[in-house]
């Protein structure tokens, strides 16, 4: 039996009312964001071509090398890992024989030991590993032929075991070359070329067209990683170059045009909070917890809050991205977060203040127990089925089950906790599964959208554009590897639209 015309009318009116008031529904007010990664904070894997023009590009800041005397067949070693003599007497290389490069120019380098001291020729021809900071006597000129090196001292002599001229050649082994961030790019290119490369990158990597695309695909916010040097524009400290502040202003302009909100994310803090390239670490060290660096970071938060607090597109400020659990003490972080909260509140009562969970072996509940602030606070969790040997063993079905069986209970438990809202600030539709089908990717993405959609604040996909296509949000949407995520694609919304169509048919017939 068909639905009476009166029933069609009532159903249609209800749908029209619900559709017109849908913006007040939780599904429409939660954050559905995309990160603008690799734009104002460089990550080489996102756009590798940025590094193409660097001479000796395999010897960037932070590259770890080991040096073996060709004549003696022994490794150069900093006894005790630094702080003492330098010898060439080890048959096998380990941490004492591994040095981190500080690049001065494409031919001049400083060598840092595992304990932090630098090789120095401060005593003339006697080389030791005793300098706490580098200068002229800690700078060595490299004569290179592929992996073979001569290391020239300031006085014109060469580093050579036993000071035998035939022993001056070392074979260099690159142990790790995994830092490709802002420091490596700008210092590797030099100030003039870095200005050219980064100006072009900031202008064209993300444009207003991307903001338009996001707005048309159900995204209502962007999370924008920035580096601490943005507060010093137009004259940031070397090697960083000017322009990131103007670009952030432009992002806020586009956001206002296309109806998006902005989360400013302090991704790179002075001294580095995690030793990774995306924190602009020079050599993998984590020096952020020092009082001087924390004070400098708070100055950056003050600058950002003061500049953008009254901008209608500001949604929130994230005080620090991914502090390391192994290097940043919880007490230090909590103290910083509380002070940062007060700074933001001094300019805005409405802006959300976002606290990122420590990465590594840390319980997200630790921030809920810290009483970081009374109003509009958010804890940011980053969920990847990557970066852990556990996930390497999982097939497609097991990855999807992990989202439902492990992530869902954690999100729900945190949602119920008495404290900040929950934000899945980074996640991606990528995994370690080889040869996965498009359907499997769709199911994996669907699971994440369903589970992370339960988070009380919302979620943010990493990232808008990337050289690795499954990390690229726009590629995923255009090629239908990621389906959903927009309220316009939800079953409830489709039902409302159907009701409206029925109502229109009723009044037109």
For the regions a protein language model found, what residue spans apply to each?
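Cleavable N-terminal signal peptides of Sec/SRP-targeted secreted and luminal proteins
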Residues: 4-22, 494-508
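N-terminal structural segment of carbohydrate-active enzymes
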Residues: 20-63, 173-231, 235-238
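Active-site region of glycoside hydrolase catalytic domains
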Residues: 28-30, 44, 175-178, 272-433, ...
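Structural signal for hydrophobic/aromatic residues that build the beta-strand cores
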Residues: 34, 76, 119, 159, ...
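Lectin-like carbohydrate-binding module/patch detector with strong preference for beta-trefoil
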Residues: 57-176
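An active-site-proximal structural segment forming one wall of the substrate-binding cleft
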Residues: 196-220, 237-267, 279-316, 341-343
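Extended, alpha-helix-rich binding/interface surfaces that flank or overlap catalytic cores
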Residues: 458-462, 466-484
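C-terminal GPI-anchoring signal of eukaryotic secretory precursors
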Residues: 482-495
């Amino acid at each position: 039996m068909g639905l009476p015309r009166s029933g069609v009318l009532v159903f249609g009116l209800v749908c029209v009312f619900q559709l017109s008031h849908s913006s007040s529904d939780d599904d429409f007010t939660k954050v559905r964001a995309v990160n603008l990664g690799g734009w104002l904070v460089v990550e080489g894997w996102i756009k590798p071509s940025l590094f193409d023009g660097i001479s000796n590009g395999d010897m960037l800041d932070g590259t770890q090398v080991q040096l073996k005397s060709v004549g003696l067949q022994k490794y150069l070693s900093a006894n005790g890992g630094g702080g003492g003599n330098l010898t060439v007497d080890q048959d096998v290389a380990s941490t004492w024989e591994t040095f981190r490069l500080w690049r001065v120019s494409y031919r001049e380098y400083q060598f840092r030991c595992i304990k932090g001291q630098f090789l120095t020729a401060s005593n003339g021809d006697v080389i030791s590993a005793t300098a706490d900071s580098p200068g002229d006597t800690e700078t060595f000129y490299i004569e290179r032929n592929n992996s073979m090196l001569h290391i020239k001292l300031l006085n014109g002599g060469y580093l050579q075991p036993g000071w035998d001229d035939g022993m001056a050649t070392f074979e260099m082994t690159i142990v790790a070359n995994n830092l490709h961030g802002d420091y490596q790019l700008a210092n590797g290119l030099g100030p003039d070329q870095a200005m050219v490369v980064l100006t072009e990158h900031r202008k064209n990597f993300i444009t207003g067209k991307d903001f338009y695309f996001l707005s048309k695909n159900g995204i209502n916010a962007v999370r924008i990683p920035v580096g601490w040097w943005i507060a010093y524009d137009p004259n940031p400290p070397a090697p960083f170059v000017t322009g990131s502040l103007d670009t952030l202003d432009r992002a806020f302009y586009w956001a206002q045009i296309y109806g998006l909100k902005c989360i400013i994310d302090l991704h790179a803090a002075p001294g580095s909070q995690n030793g990774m390239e995306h924190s602009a670490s020079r050599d993998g060290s984590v020096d952020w917890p020092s009082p001087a660096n924390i004070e400098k970071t708070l100055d950056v938060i003050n600058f950002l809050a003061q500049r953008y607090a009254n901008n209608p597109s500001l949604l929130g400020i994230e005080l620090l991205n991914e502090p390391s659990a192994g290097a940043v003490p919880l007490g230090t972080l909590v103290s910083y977060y509380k002070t940062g909260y007060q700074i933001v509140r001094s300019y805005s009562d409405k802006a959300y203040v976002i606290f990122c969970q420590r990465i590594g072996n840390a319980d997200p509940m630790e921030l809920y127990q810290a009483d970081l602030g009374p109003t509009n606070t958010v804890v940011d969790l980053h969920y990847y089925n990557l970066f852990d040997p556990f996930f390497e063993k999982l097939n497609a079905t097991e990855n999807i089950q992990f989202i439902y069986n492990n992530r869902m209970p954690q999100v729900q438990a945190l949602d119920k906790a008495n404290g900040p809202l929950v934000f899945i600030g980074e996640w991606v539709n990528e995994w370690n599964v080889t040869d996965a089908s498009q359907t499997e990717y769709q199911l994996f993405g669907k699971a994440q959208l369903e589970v992370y959609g339960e988070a009380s604040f919302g979620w943010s996909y990493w990232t808008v554009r990337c050289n690795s296509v499954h990390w690229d949000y726009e590629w995923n949407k255009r090629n239908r590897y990621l389906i959903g995520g927009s309220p316009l694609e939800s079953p409830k919304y489709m039902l409302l639209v159907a009701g409206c169509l029925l109502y229109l048919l009723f009044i037109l017939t």
